[in-house]
Swiss-Prot record:
It is a multi-pass membrane protein. Belongs to the mitochondrial carrier (TC 2.A.29) family. This is Uncharacterized mitochondrial carrier C1604.04. Pfam families: Mito_carr (PF00153). One of its GO terms (biological process) is thiamine pyrophosphate transmembrane transport. Gene3D superfamilies: Mitochondrial carrier domain (1.50.40.10). Solcar repeats lie at residues 14-95, 102-185, 190-274. GO terms for molecular function: thiamine pyrophosphate transmembrane transporter activity; thiamine transmembrane transporter activity. It comes from Schizosaccharomyces pombe (strain 972 / ATCC 24843). The keyword rRNA processing does not apply. The keyword Lipid biosynthesis does not apply. It is found in: Mitochondrion inner membrane.
Length: 283
């Protein structure tokens, strides 16, 4: 077994709760810090407006606290999604460590599968977060949940699910593929710096590739009755706003995803290393 394979074997052989805890902690901290970018990005996508007027209108009419609107739901979303994604990826990597396949392909497939699993696990929270971010006033969680259920039943919590799977699966696959490749090159810089820089590179690259799909999915989640299908929504945005409409909010999203992924991966790797040290026989 080569050094890289041996490192992977050790890295992905930790107890499941290590990845759950590290993934959950890193995702929750990340979410709190990037919440304002997420609120503005979602409003730009669903209103097809630009950054300055959306930010100005939000703060003037609703106050600074509006930038964290729906953050309780979003924190739960990030906790569930982050824990599920990192657990799934680590266990899949452990299971495929002896697979005779290109490392980049394995990372992509494991990342895609992890993203799909995490999406299915956390999707109702994602739907509620998107709706809350678009409201002018912060709704109470229980009444809002009851309202969604009364209007559309269980399906109301899963609008555009298949399209989210199509978007998030490949996004997660690209992220982990780019991250592992970047981290392998940058590892001589040390764990903290290599994980931070690799998170920025992988997050930005993956987001740029999948952003148009994200715009359509967010629009479908917010206005599910306005469109017949993913294609209908895509064409409607394109006809009304062109290519720019599909990338509306990309600049804000990049401001969010670059530091967000840097924070997530830095805290995740450091937490995982700490748990590994504490669990070692020598500790």
């Amino acid at each position: 077994m080569g050094l890289a394979k041996q490192k992977d074997s050790q890295e992905f052989a930790q107890p499941v709760w290590h990845y759950t805890l590290a993934g959950g902690i890193s995702s929750v901290i990340c979410r709190f810090m990037i919440a304002p970018f997420d609120v503005i990005k979602i409003r730009m996508q669903i209103t097809q407006s630009s950054l300055r007027p959306v930010f100005k209108e939000t703060v003037q009419k609703e106050g600074v606290r509006a930038l964290w609107r729906g953050n309780v739901v979003a924190e739960l979303l990030y906790l569930v999604y982050g824990a599920a994604e990192f657990v799934a990826f680590s266990k899949l990597k452990h299971l495929t460590e002896n697979l005779a396949m290109n490392d980049h392909a394995v990372n992509f497939l494991c990342g895609t599968s992890a993203g799909i699993f995490a999406t299915l696990t956390s999707y109702p929270l994602d739907t509620m977060r998107t709706k809350f971010a678009s409201y002018a006033k912060t709704p109470h969680m229980l009444p809002a949940t009851k309202k969604i259920y009364a209007e559309a039943g269980i399906k109301g919590f899963f609008p555009g699910l298949k399209f989210s799977v199509i978007q998030i699966g490949p996004y997660a696959g690209c992220f982990f593929m780019f991250y592992r490749a970047s981290e392998a090159v940058l590892s001589p810089l040390g764990l903290a710096l290599s994980s931070t820089l690799s998170g920025v590179i992988a997050g930005a690259g993956s987001k740029a590739i999948m952003f148009p799909v994200d715009t359509v999915v967010k629009t479908l989640q917010t206005f599910p009755s306005n469109y017949k299908s993913f294609k209908d929504c895509f064409l409607s945005i394109y006809r009304n706003s062109g290519i720019k409409g599909l990338y509306r909010g990309l600049s804000v999203s990049m401001l969010k995803v670059a530091p967000g992924r840097a924070i997530t991966m830095l805290i995740y790797e450091q937490t995982l290393q700490g748990l590994r040290t504490l669990s070692s026989p020598e500790a």
